[in-house]
Amino acid sequence: MSEFDAQRVAERIDIVLDILVAGDYHSAIHNLEILKAELLRQVAESTPDIPKAPWEI
């Protein structure tokens, strides 16, 4: 994902829900982890470096 697109995220969540309905929990969790990582990476790229608090190191 190069930029945040709410429609695309919603579509991917729908896919995960379909996978859950089919009963493939492992794949659904894996897909959610991938989506989370992509979103966090995108946020990290778009925000300036903020010093971490000592408990976040």
Curated annotation (Swiss-Prot):
It holds the Pfam family YciZ. Induction: Expressed approximately equally in exponential and stationary phases (at protein level). It comes from the Bacteria. InterPro entries: UPF0509. NCBIfam families: PRK13658.1. Belongs to the UPF0509 family. HAMAP family: UPF0509. This is UPF0509 protein YciZ. It comes from Escherichia coli (strain K12). The lineage of its organism: Bacteria, Pseudomonadati, Pseudomonadota, Gammaproteobacteria, Enterobacterales.
